[in-house]
Design a protein with these regions (language model features):
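Conserved, structured core segments of small domains
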Residues: 1-96
Length: 96
């Protein structure tokens, strides 16, 4: 089975409140077998504007597991913190 990857592009709008998301989300990711590959490190954008200075990449064992995590009851309240304190997008892609 192919791995699933979450690619998040974010601009934090309220850093103080966003810290709660940063504290809570790793446990939920781990519960679904996810692991961080990149979490807000240095990056360069080509062929577009850099509107989202925070890039996060998470690998899950399968594409289905990534979707299960994103739609889970455990992630729902944590996701609400992120949505209230940042702008951006999450993309879930199936690996090769």
């Amino acid at each position: 089975m192919a791995a699933g990857y979450v690619i998040a592009q974010l601009k934090v709008t309220n850093l103080e409140n966003y810290k709660e998301y940063v504290e809570k989300v790793p446990d939920v990711i781990k519960k679904y077998g996810g692991e961080y590959l990149a979490r807000g490190g240095e990056h360069q954008v080509f062929e577009a504007e850099d509107n989202f200075p925070r890039i996060v990449i998470i690998k899950f064992p399968t594409y289905e597991k990534a979707l299960e995590w994103y739609h889970s009851d455990e992630y729902k309240p944590v996701k609400a913190i992120r949505l209230s304190n940042s702008e951006g997008s999450n993309i879930i892609v199936k690996g090769l």
